[in-house]
């Protein structure tokens, strides 16, 4: 009987766990913009060794969520308008492409799932539950990403979304979040009717509304 070798995966799993936990702390504001992060202190809080935490911080630096100064410190990246705008423009383009590819193939089940997600989103925005609002927003757009099936589009969105997530939290915390409910319903209706042009233009409007708020957001770079 052949023996299947056991692969050493624990280090990778710990690294991924550290990335998820630290990213969540940054996006939720638990680690606020500009705050200094020490790998040893984070490792202690997470119950991990320093090695996976350092690897995680390097990955989060690639995502633009932390920045390191050699021989100095690592800190949570301030909300820098140009960087957020650059990322948001890319994410908008990818969502437009995903909708263009997905809309002609949307099923009745897809429409039902999106409408259910938008109902959860509306309730969460109305009650100020930001985490649930963001999760419901992700679920709605995930239906179209899954239907699109373009791995490169998904990878690009996953790569740049963290850079704009903090701005999204500000949007959904304000009255602007209520406008997203209406835009979502327009998007869903366009997909249900097979109106690709309307679905894409509504997606553009959703992201343009977010980009317009950059003009109202203070630059935290110091």
Q: PLM features: what roles do these ranges have?
A:
Residues 84-87, 114, 133, 137, ...:
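Hydrophobic packing residues in well-ordered alpha-helices of helical domains and bundles
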Residues 97-123, 127:
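Amphipathic alpha-helical dimerization/coiled-coil segments
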Residues 53, 111, 115, 154-161, ...:
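Short, well-structured alpha-helical segments
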């Amino acid at each position: 009987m052949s023996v299947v070798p056991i692969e050493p995966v624990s280090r990778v799993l710990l690294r991924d766990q550290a990335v998820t936990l630290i990213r969540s702390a940054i996006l939720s504001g638990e680690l606020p913009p500009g705050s200094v992060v020490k790998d040893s202190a984070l490792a202690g809080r997470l119950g991990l060794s320093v090695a996976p935490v350092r690897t995680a911080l390097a990955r989060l630096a690639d995502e633009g969520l932390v920045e390191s100064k050699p021989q100095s410190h690592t800190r949570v990246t301030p909300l820098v308008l140009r960087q957020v705008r650059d990322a948001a423009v890319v994410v908008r383009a990818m969502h437009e492409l995903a909708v263009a590819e997905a809309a002609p193939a949307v099923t009745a089940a897809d429409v039902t799932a999106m409408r259910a997600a938008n109902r959860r989103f509306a309730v969460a925005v109305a009650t100020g539950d930001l985490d649930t609002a963001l999760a419901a927003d992700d679920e709605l757009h995930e239906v179209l990403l899954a239907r699109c099936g373009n791995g490169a589009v998904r990878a690009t969105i996953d790569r740049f979304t963290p850079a704009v997530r903090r701005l999204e939290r500000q949007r959904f915390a304000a009255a602007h979040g209520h406008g997203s409910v209406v835009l979502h319903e327009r998007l869903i209706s366009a997909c249900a009717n097979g109106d690709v042009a309307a679905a894409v233009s509504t997606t553009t409007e959703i992201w343009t509304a977010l980009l317009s708020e950059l003009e109202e957001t203070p630059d935290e770079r110091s």
